[in-house]
Amino acid sequence: MDYSEIMVRHGELSTKGKNRMRFINKLKNNIQDVLAPFPAITVRSDRDRTHVSLNGTDYQPIVEALKLVFGVQALSPVYKLEKSVPLLVTAVQDIMTSLYRDGLTFKIATKRSDHAFELDSRELNSLLGGAVFEVLPNIQAQMKHPDVTLKVEIRDEAAYISYEEIKGAGGLPVGTSGKGMLMLSGGIDSPVAGYLALKRGLDIEVVHFASPPYTSPGALAKAQDLTRRLTRFGGNIQFIEVPFTEIQEEIKNKAPEAYLMTLTRRFMMRITDAIREQRKGLVIVNGESLGQVASQTLESMQAINAVTSTPIIRPVVTMDKLEIIEMAQAIDTFDISIQPFEDCCTIFAPDRPKTNPKLSNAEKYEERFDIDGLVQRAVSGIVVTEITPEIVNDEVENLIDALL
């Protein structure tokens, strides 16, 4: 027998009361986005399950994709069949025969939500267990810790049989907690910050600053590839490329070297906040980790934050670098992040950046710039690209390989 579908059990959604169906529908949409590379798949949701019909598609890549989607508590490959006792008997016998090995123990666990069905749960357990013994007389039943628990669900629309439960990613469906702008440089930390924000249901749009010719097409492709990795956890992501060359050249020419990083970050924050307001976001997310680099001391954060009253979420702020690296490896962004392309934060980095910049000094140096004009020109020049889980071709990988 081939699996008919993957049955998805919802995570924290069970606690969402009147908003439950809104959360479930969002999860359904996210699953459809993530499974877009598999055109035969269909997705249907009810109040306590989401059903991913395979329609002949190999179940293993579908399981691997679904395991990453936030809002999924657990999933099981299942056999779906008509609510017929003879069909159930035959299916249970076939499944257990295919799984049998010497010494195997099993139990039947039936759940009946369709109370109009002809047998109750106890009667089904007895009948189906007896059917297994008919074809496998040497198999042993074990109620407490069996090798195989064959779960049979009798629901209104059909019967479902499964024996494997796979842990999902948990968390909340992406998009159920509002929208935020993720400042993604291309390093190790910001993709991890994005992953953690996605886990709590935040719909992120990626903001990436590009300064050609100082930053290369490879750096841009790298940032887009990191974004594509993040789409596996909740579906499509808008990638916003910000032209930053003019601002960086202005800062380089007019500001003291020690304040280059502080002023650069202040402009980035202003621009990100302007984009957030334009695109109706609620928060800004970044990958700052306290004390990791000069721009991430409390004094630096305070001087940089002063340009906005928008909440700044820093998911990795208390994590050690090794912890961040381990998480980056786990979510498959680390190998991309360490590709040797310079980003906007490194091309004009001073040898001795100020670790305790004074806000008054930063504001004094910024009097040398047309702040509003620079920000407005950057925001008006953004390029927005929708990044999807589906890789249409290998252009990104080929470009990176050619530039390395």
Swiss-Prot record:
Pathway: Cofactor biosynthesis; thiamine diphosphate biosynthesis
PROSITE patterns named among the record's database cross-references: THUMP
CDD domains, alphabetized: PPase_ThiI, THUMP_ThiI
Domain annotation THUMP: ranges: 60-165
Annotated EC: 2.8.1.4
GO CC terms: cytosol
Residues engaged in binding ATP: 183-184, 208-209, 265, 287, 296
Record localization: Cytoplasm
GO molecular function (one): CCA tRNA nucleotidyltransferase activity
Swiss-Prot/TrEMBL keywords: ATP-binding, Cytoplasm, Nucleotide-binding, RNA-binding, Thiamine biosynthesis, Transferase, tRNA-binding
GO annotation terms (biological process): thiamine biosynthetic process; thiamine diphosphate biosynthetic process; thiazole biosynthetic process; tRNA 4-thiouridine biosynthesis
Catalytic activity: [ThiI sulfur-carrier protein]-S-sulfanyl-L-cysteine + a uridine in tRNA + 2 reduced [2Fe-2S]-[ferredoxin] + ATP + H(+) = [ThiI sulfur-carrier protein]-L-cysteine + a 4-thiouridine in tRNA + 2 oxidized [2Fe-2S]-[ferredoxin] + AMP + diphosphate; [ThiS sulfur-carrier protein]-C-terminal Gly-Gly-AMP + S-sulfanyl-L-cysteinyl-[cysteine desulfurase] + AH2 = [ThiS sulfur-carrier protein]-C-terminal-Gly-aminoethanethioate + L-cysteinyl-[cysteine desulfurase] + A + AMP + 2 H(+)
UniProt family annotation: Belongs to the ThiI family.
Role summary: Catalyzes the ATP-dependent transfer of a sulfur to tRNA to produce 4-thiouridine in position 8 of tRNAs, which functions as a near-UV photosensor. Also catalyzes the transfer of sulfur to the sulfur carrier protein ThiS, forming ThiS-thiocarboxylate. This is a step in the synthesis of thiazole, in the thiamine biosynthesis pathway. The sulfur is donated as persulfide by IscS.
Protein name: Probable tRNA sulfurtransferase
Organismal lineage: Bacteria, Bacillati, Bacillota, Bacilli, Lactobacillales
